[in-house]
């Protein structure tokens, strides 16, 4: 999009209009020639002072025609930009599916859900079993006793706590994959329907000993807090909330004598917090072996949650934001080796000093704040809450400009006059440039934390080196963690390193290698060796699952079930006492205000990274409460840190959601066309 003070010489390519500016004032768009200071204030640039008035008239006549054509090119709606920005209907940018009628799909069957107390106790008991897993743990065959001590008690608890699905007469079959991965299969009556998979994981992240005194309740107490309607402890959200609720949903359906047409699968890993290579990788391979590549209809795993009106990112609008993709991931290890010796005779830069230069270089050049076409789900999420009472005015206006640019780009009309007069003008290019500029302004309008969730990031997390204060460090290493935006790839990060560090290596006489690629070879003058290695699991972001068009059946079904399960006019489910054993009522149409739903991009990574061989219909959704947290502490801000907790309403609603999802998938198409 051409803006004020932007020249058109690159678009037109002729000197006579080289300094024409496009203006868009209240009276409408027009072209204005700028003045050449050397020629005087009243002479357009490109015309000699001796030009006749006739020449001037001809020039301005041409400019008038060009202005008319430009107005037709950009669109006559531009004159009403301010009005249009205020009147773009929200439903045009945030369409909503109707709530799915689960009651009708049940065909008279009554589901026997657990009581609120029983659901709370199940989550509490799960938290009390410590299933902590750290990084870089050896394989289950090498450390069999270690793995058994953690996960065998938990698997036994699951089997005891959900008796109906584990009964010998149950249609559900349980298998152990790679010893501790749990795979539950409930065969459907119609083998032509691809299975639906619900995922979760058993493991939790460690609790740092130095933080124990910061916990309101001990991290593995599973304390049921009646006052705040909360279950406290490590894993109460990530991921035992969803593990318990998915299993509870299947237990409910078995107990209620539900008969699935579509095969139902629970795939439960045991090292997601590490990288999933012992759990999810083996589970995925087993499912591909049984059902073939692309043999699964739909996967729902943990992921981005429901946001209450009080949660960050909602801007005051309750909304569900299931992720249709997740960012890629890459760890980089930087190792520097140099000559040691006594610190009384130091070189200009020690290995630690060189590492400091490299880190400073990286942090001085972060990845750009940009949005691409692959960011459409993230933009949709913002658009769906642009009427929120807490959204800043500048951000709302930036969103509206993106919407206008998207509309202009989707307008396929042409203007014949422009084709004749400006054959080199690329109308599509102008509209794409306008959209790029609008997206840039949108990123600039976001706060720093929000921008980090949408772009490729880097974080220097570990630096180690040196052994004694008077000894030159012979080696130092650092780890950098990257999360890769959907529009970028691992190769993008690799090129970023090469572009920054090759000149630095040449300047300071460093030998530089990246994996097996020698970027700057060593010489007799080399002062240190720098080795860069891609470390851990490398993971490119995948294309977002469709949320529009002919292949969006799975998304539409998921959205409809979410809107059936959560309503802003529904009160929270409460546990009045530890003797209160009431069963939550299933929604029978008494609640009308369904929650909004928007696709999003998962800012972190899940076990689904291993499941792309099975389906493109992968959704990452954190089924929780829609109500503000009574503790005053957002549960999303306490995952992986002190005071992790989940509301009692969350475990009740999550169980209802997964049961509703399985019932709906029994009746509706989710396969790709």
Question: Language-model segments: what does each one mean?
Answer:
Residues 4, 22-24, 28-31, 36-61, ...:
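Metal-dependent amide/peptide-bond hydrolase catalytic core
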Residues 48-50, 54, 58-60, 69-234, ...:
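Acidic/His- and Gly-rich active-site-bordering loop/insert found
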Residues 124-132, 159, 163, 167, ...:
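Sec-exported extracytoplasmic/periplasmic mature domains
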Residues 127-128, 183, 197, 265-268, ...:
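Structural recognition of the beta-strand scaffold that forms the well-ordered cores
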Residues 133-134, 191, 202-205, 271-275, ...:
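Solvent-exposed loop/turn segments at secondary-structure junctions
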Residues 192-195, 260-264, 294-297, 593-594, ...:
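Loop/turn elements at helix/coil->beta-strand transitions in domains of secreted/extracellular proteins
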Residues 227-238, 595, 642-643:
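Short pre-catalytic strand/loop immediately N-terminal to key active-site residues, enriched for Gly-Thr
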Residues 230-321:
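Acidic/histidine-rich catalytic neighborhood of metal-dependent amide-processing enzymes
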């Amino acid at each position: 999009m051409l803006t004020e003070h932007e020249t058109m010489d690159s678009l037109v390519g002729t000197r006579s209009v080289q300094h024409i500016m496009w203006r868009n004032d209240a009276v409408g768009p027009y072209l204005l020639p700028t003045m050449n200071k050397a020629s005087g204030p009243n002479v357009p640039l490109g015309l000699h002072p001796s030009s006749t008035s006739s020449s001037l008239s001809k020039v301005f006549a041409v400019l008038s025609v060009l202005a008319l054509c430009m107005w037709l090119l950009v669109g006559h709606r531009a004159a009403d930009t301010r009005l249009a920005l205020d009147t773009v209907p929200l439903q045009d940018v945030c369409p909503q599916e109707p709530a799915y009628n689960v009651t009708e799909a049940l065909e008279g069957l009554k589901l026997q859900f657990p009581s609120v107390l029983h659901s709370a106790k199940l989550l509490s008991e799960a938290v009390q079993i410590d299933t902590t897993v750290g990084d870089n743990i050896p394989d289950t065959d090498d450390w069999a006793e270690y793995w058994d001590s953690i996960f065998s008690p938990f698997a036994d608890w699951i089997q005891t706590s959900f008796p109906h699905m584990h009964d010998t007469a149950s249609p559900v079959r349980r298998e152990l994959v790679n010893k501790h991965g749990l795979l539950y299969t409930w065969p459907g009556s119609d083998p032509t329907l691809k299975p639906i998979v619900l995922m979760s994981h058993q493991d939790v992240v460690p609790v740092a000993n130095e933080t124990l005194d910061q916990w309101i309740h001990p991290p593995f107490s599973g304390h049921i807090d009646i006052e705040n309607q909360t279950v406290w402890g490590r894993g109460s959200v990530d991921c035992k909330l969803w593990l318990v609720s998915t299993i509870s949903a299947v237990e409910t359906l078995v107990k209620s004598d539900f008969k699935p047409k579509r095969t139902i699968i629970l795939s439960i890993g045991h090292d997601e917090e590490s990288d999933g290579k012992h759990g999810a990788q083996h589970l995925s391979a087993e499912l591909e072996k049984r059902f073939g590549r692309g043999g699964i209809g739909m996967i729902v795993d943990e992921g981005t949650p429901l946001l209450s009106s009080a949660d960050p990112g909602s801007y005051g609008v309750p909304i569900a934001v299931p992720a249709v993709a997740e960012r890629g991931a890459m760890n980089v290890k930087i190792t520097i080796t140099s000559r040691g010796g006594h610190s009384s005779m130091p070189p200009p830069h020690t290995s630690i000093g060189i590492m400091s230069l490299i880190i400073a270089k990286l942090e001085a050049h972060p990845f750009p704040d940009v949005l691409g076409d692959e960011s459409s789900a993230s933009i949709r999420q913002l658009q769906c809450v642009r009427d929120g009472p807490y959204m800043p005015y500048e951000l709302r206006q930036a969103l509206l400009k993106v919407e206008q640019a998207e509309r202009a780009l989707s307008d396929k009309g042409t203007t014949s006059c422009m084709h004749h007069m400006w054959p080199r003008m690329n109308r599509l290019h102008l509209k794409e440039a306008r959209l790029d500029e609008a997206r840039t302004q949108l990123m600039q309008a976001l706060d720093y934390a929000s921008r980090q969730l949408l772009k490729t990031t880097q974080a220097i997390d570990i630096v180690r080196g040196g052994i004694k204060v008077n000894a030159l460090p012979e080696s130092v290493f650092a780890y950098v963690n990257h999360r890769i935006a959907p529009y970028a790839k691992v190769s993008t990060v690799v090129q970023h390193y090469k572009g920054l560090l090759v000149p630095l290596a040449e300047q300071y006489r460093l030998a530089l290698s990246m994996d097996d690629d020698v970027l700057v070879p060593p010489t007799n003058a080399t002062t240190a060796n720098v080795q860069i290695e891609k470390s851990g699991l490398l993971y490119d972001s995948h294309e977002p699952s469709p949320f529009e068009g002919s292949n969006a059946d799975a998304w539409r079904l998921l959205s409809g079930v979410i809107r059936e399960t959560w309503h802003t006019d529904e009160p929270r489910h409460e546990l009045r006492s530890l003797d209160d054993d009431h069963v939550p009522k299933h929604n029978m149409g008494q609640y009308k205000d369904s929650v909004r739903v928007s696709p999003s991009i998962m800012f972190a990574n899940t076990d689904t990274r291993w499941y792309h061989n099975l389906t493109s219909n992968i959704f990452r959704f954190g089924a929780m409460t829609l109500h503000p947290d009574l503790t005053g502490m957002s549960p999303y801000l306490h995952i992986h840190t002190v005071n992790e907790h989940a509301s009692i309403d969350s475990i009740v609603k999550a169980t209802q959601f997964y049961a509703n999802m399985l019932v709906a998938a029994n009746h509706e198409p989710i396969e790709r066309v």
